[in-house]
Amino acid sequence: MGATPRWATLSIALPEENDAWLTAFARGFFRMADQHGIELVGGDTTRGALTLSITVMGEVLPGQALRRDGAQTGDDIWVSGVIGSAALALAYRQGRLFMEQIDAARVLPALYLPTPRVELGIALRGIASSAIDISDGLLADLGHILERSQRGAQLEFAALPTLPVVQSYLHEAVARDCVLAGGDDYELCFTAPSDRGDAVQAVAHSAGVAVTRVGRITAEAGLTLIGADGQPLPYAKTGYDHFAA
């Protein structure tokens, strides 16, 4: 985390030529690339099952990258934006959760048009002690930080930032799993010393992104989820398993 994106490679496999699909894909790809100043420098095309492989490369000065192994005991845990919306939308599309259409319309954009927090990642250099994007689920991705940093965490469920429409479905177990372990949010989960809260808020404001403190790093290994009553909450699912899908 924290690098300035510079270049990308793109490899595509398609079962057959489809000019309309390629035109729409290219429009979206280059819109995002141009937004972040990324040059397409190579790749490949071939016939086969639909496959997209994109690699993005960037630059960051030595010692400034936001890694997973820098969290320290007492650090605050932060999350950018809101989480759970994309996973809730996917659960709706897959028929695992009934939603009113007006509610579904509020979360579907998070699934189809996620926003990478590039500017925030860059702004957090020198402030955050560790960072990761939430692609596999908050519990799983925070778990990667804890594993690499050899620390534990207390996470406050009531503090997790979600849209009001997501909150209205939290009585459903699948919705709670979406917030904790759904993934596809691409928000940032990061840690920072407890005395850098004002600095975190200032750079987030400059980047145009809301951030929320959701817990703290502990010396003891393990991740404890805390309920509104201050008592530990049980959880089973932690996130997407790449080799179980």
Regions found by a protein language model. Give the residues of each.
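Hydrophobic side chains in well-ordered alpha-helices
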Residues: 65, 120, 199-203
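Polyanion-binding loop/helix "lid" in catalytic or ligand-binding cores
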Residues: 102-144
